[in-house]
Swiss-Prot record:
Domain of life where this protein originates: Bacteria
Region Disordered, annotated ranges: 327-363
Keyword set, alphabetical order: ATP-binding, Cytoplasm, DNA damage, DNA recombination, DNA repair, DNA-binding, Nucleotide-binding, SOS response
Bias type Basic and acidic residues, positions: 329-363
SMART domains: AAA
Cell compartments where the protein resides: Cytoplasm
Family recorded in the similarity comment: Belongs to the RecA family.
MF annotations from Gene Ontology: ATP binding; ATP hydrolysis activity; ATP-dependent DNA damage sensor activity; damaged DNA binding; single-stranded DNA binding
GO terms (BP aspect): DNA recombination; DNA repair; SOS response
Stated name of the protein: Protein RecA
Role noted for this protein: Can catalyze the hydrolysis of ATP in the presence of single-stranded DNA, the ATP-dependent uptake of single-stranded DNA by duplex DNA, and the ATP-dependent hybridization of homologous single-stranded DNAs. It interacts with LexA causing its activation and leading to its autocatalytic cleavage.
Length: 363
């Protein structure tokens, strides 16, 4: 077949595919307009840097897992707050029935506009998530947690009944359906997960996450959250030093670690992580226990230096700008990648497609 004939045959095939499956079903890679990754900040500057693209990528699945009381829900709620600050809509599927509105509000979440669901079964929770995402009106949905998405058969059965692999099959089926919709609507889907231990493992890591392997495969970013040490002052425990490891990353190099302070009742200490990041890049000098900025001492000891930054917003802002530039996560580049108008147009297109599909099914 000659070159011109091949081109004509390919064009005819592409037109046929577009006619049958709709515009955009197939395209040349160079034709795609939104080649850059659109992101939303995580609420932690250190985590933005660790993920490598300045925040959570839109239209992707994120898994946040770790031991109990390590800070998983706090990490997710900070993401919800960041989305709402930018005028987005957030949904929270509280399968654990443990949502604390007062704590969420302290982290900056607008609880009046937050869409909350406390489903009775795993099927109900995932169906609600699917319906919300398919609407094209949700910017972020958090499922807390995968381990609490109990299949209906287990809820209705007797205590002690064996339901081998039921939750894994449920998650596998749900993610097959959700992944495409999440991508089209540019929704960030955060799945919080717990840790279990495999029985009889002698060598290697015995820890695993419930819900089967599907979530591991479909996740673009997987974050492991672990407590490192307690933060104490004058004998009182104020919070925990937490390590967030990027164990999987499809948008940037993985295995980077963000260390943050999670303070009781306040969430992630942004002044603390800013101080650490600035000290690492020599923006703030550290000599012994003293911290200095441009030859001016700002505090003896980490907690005093943090307090100084919080009490001097002008210096805080200057240091933050320098840190963003040093780590390549300045807000302008993130805003350029987000391109809100394109995201809005894409959502409207998806919403119209869903309406058309539903009307055709009704006929």
């Amino acid at each position: 077949m000659a070159k011109d004939e091949k081109k004509a045959a390919l064009d005819a095939a592409l037109k046929k595919i577009e006619k049958n499956f709709g515009k955009g079903a197939v395209m040349r890679m160079g034709e795609k307009a939104d080649t850059q990754i659109s992101t939303v900040p995580t609420g932690s500057l250190a985590l933005d840097a660790a993920i490598g693209v300045g925040g959570y990528p839109r239209g992707r699945i994120i898994e946040v897992y770790g031991p109990e009381s390590s800070g998983k829900t706090t990490v997710a709620l900070h993401a919800v707050a960041e989305v709402q600050k930018r005028g987005g809509t957030a949904a929270y599927i509280d399968a654990e029935n443990a949502m604390d509105p007062a704590y969420a509000e302290a982290l900056g979440v607008d609880i009046d506009s937050l869409i909350l669901s406390q489903p009775n079964t795993g099927e109900e929770g995932l169906q609600i998530a699917d319906t919300l995402i398919s609407s094209g009106a949700i910017d972020i949905v958090v499922v807390d947690s995968v381990a609490a998405l109990v299949p209906r058969a287990e809820i209705e059965g007797e205590m002690g009944d064996a339901h081998v692999g039921l939750q894994a099959r449920l998650m596998s089926q749900a993610l097959r359906k959700l992944s495409g919709t999440i991508s089209k609507t540019k929704t960030i889907a955060i799945f919080i997960n717990q840790i279990r231990e495999k029985v009889g493992v002698m060598f290697g890591n015995p820890e695993t996450t419930p819900g089967g392997r599907a979530l591991k495969f479909y996740s673009t970013v997987r974050l492991e959250v672990r407590r490192a040490e307690q933060i104490k002052q004058s004998g009182d425990v104020l919070g925990n030093r937490v390590k967030i490891k990027v164990v999987k990353n499809k948008v940037a190099p993985p295995f980077k670690v963000a260390e943050v302070d999670i303070m009781y009742g306040k969430g992630i200490s942004q002044s603390g992580e800013l101080l650490d990041m600035a000290a690492d890049k020599d923006i703030i000098d550290k000599a012994g226990s003293w911290y200095s900025y441009k030859s001016d001492r700002i505090g003896q000891g980490r907690e005093n230096a943090k307090k100084y930054l919080e009490e001097h917003p002008d210096i805080y802002q200057k240091v933050q700008e320098q840190v963003r530039q040093a780590y390549g996560i300045d807000e302008k580049s993130i805003a350029d990648r987000e391109n809100p108008e394109k995201i809005k147009e894409k959502r409207e297109e998806t919403s119209e497609e869903n309406k058309t599909d539903n009307s055709e099914k009704t006929k």
